[in-house]
Amino acid sequence: YAIMETGLGGRLDSVSICTPVISVITSISLDHAEILGDTLSKITKEKVGIIKPMVPCVTINSHPDEVQTIIENECMKKKSPLIITTNSKQLLYTIGLKGNVQRENARIAELVIKTLNPTFNETYIKQGLKNVKWYGRNQIVQKQPLVIFDVAHNESGIASFINFYQLLAKGKKILIISLQSRKKINSQINAILNTFD
């Protein structure tokens, strides 16, 4: 298998010319709003373009209702089985990545594997999730003093990073951040100001 990630939405993304064996929709946020639309509904309508007829779609269970409804409707329209992660905060495996969003991603990965191959050896899933590394996401570069590197660049990514950071940080908290001027992080400004010195 090859995993192909859309770079921009789904409907107009070059990846959409491929016929997948499974489609995955992770969390949806106001990213690329200048191209995809300025609301979650508009962005979701673009993202669901990755769903293909009769091809299973895996997604998370924590979408806002408006987003979930659009995904469900698209799957029904295309007769695509919709597989949604469980609500459980407990993950059956230890994962090598830190943060709540990574547990959510691990649930998605597990569902994808089990959908494609229901008899896949659980030991391999367990080992893979335990040993996975994702540089640039909640990456602890140094422990004393604590230095974390993260490439978060949208509101949901920044919220996830702050959530992770607050679990570990003690003492003086310094943030070095660089964003393109077109990035809209207004909803995270207060969280940033309240978290860092």
Which stretches of residues belong to each language-model region?
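A conserved short coil-to-beta-strand element within the FAD-binding core of flavoproteins
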Residues: N87
